[in-house]
Amino acid sequence: PEIDLKLLDGQIINNENMQGKVVVFQFTASWCSVCIKEMPHLEKEVWQRFKDENFILIGVDLKEDLEVVKEFISKTEVTYSFTIDSDGSFFESFTLPKAGITRNIVIDQEGKISFLTRLYDELEFAQMIEHIDKLLK
């Protein structure tokens, strides 16, 4: 899909500046208990491991206000970038209608979806990390 996101820090992420990078979109919300469980693992096992490579991890908060999202980020102690999908259209560009929110979508260096997860399953999460590692080698 066409990607044009403004991150909370003002940075713009789009198809053009994603080229050549591995990008993970982590769809989340402050009310999502599975997301909250997964986020420390994303921070420690994915972001801290790959952040110095050609890699971007973006938390995409679904339909929440800026203050709620800021508090959510603070509470979960993650340091990766965030954006707000205020109307859910970005999320829906990757999913079926009424899909569950907890998911990670890995985009390869050519802009293609190369891996996705649903919910938080330790085995699937480990496979995602292995997949990212292979893409970056």
What are the language-model segments listed below?
Residues 29, 62, 87:
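Active-site loop/turn elements of alpha/beta-hydrolase fold enzymes
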Residues 58, 70-109:
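Short, internal strand/loop/helix patches
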Residues 27-44:
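Conserved redox-active cysteine motifs that mediate thiol-disulfide chemistry
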Residues 2-23, 94:
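A short beta-strand-turn-helix
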Residues 48-53, 77:
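Short helix-capping segments at alpha-helix termini
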Residues 102-137:
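Thiol-/selenol-based redox modules, centered on thioredoxin-like
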